[in-house]
Amino acid sequence: MGLEKSLILFPLFVLLLGWVQPSLGKESSAQKFERQHMDSSGSSNNSPTYCNQMMKSRSMTKESCKPVNTFVHEPLEDVQAICSQENVTCKNGNRNCYKSSSALHITDCHLKGNSKYPNCNYNTNQYQKHIIVACDGNPYVPVHLDATV
């Protein structure tokens, strides 16, 4: 009797695992935004190697060198609050973008012209600028950094 039950339950278990497994470990758009753009711990401290270190540690140089990226040095809650601020049109024409009401501390990383994968080298520049983020989901949170202004 126990073997019959196992033979019936095992295929169901395999079917269930095949259905659930694809969602396991998949990064959400909000998680990707946090990984690629949030560095609440502080600023780049004028370190010329900040972008090289951060781009590598945040997995943006694994298969190629991401050409441009911006890190935001503000609390996550403050950046999430932008989703309830001034609604603006996104670069792609969508209407789910929002502009920060104040300038934020950011670091721009630009790939140096002579840099080639796997040796990704970046210029590091600090600014205080407004950011524009695309928001989505429930809760409504940033999923894309659209621009800095």
Swiss-Prot record:
Going by the UniProt annotation, this protein carries glycans at: 87
Segments of this protein annotated with the region Disordered: 30-49
Secretion signal span: 1-25
Chain positions recorded as substrate binding sites: 32, 35, 66-70, 91
The primary gene name is Rnase1
Mitochondrion in keyword set:
no
* Cellular compartment(s): Secreted
Task: Please identify the protein, giving its name as recorded.
Answer: Ribonuclease pancreatic
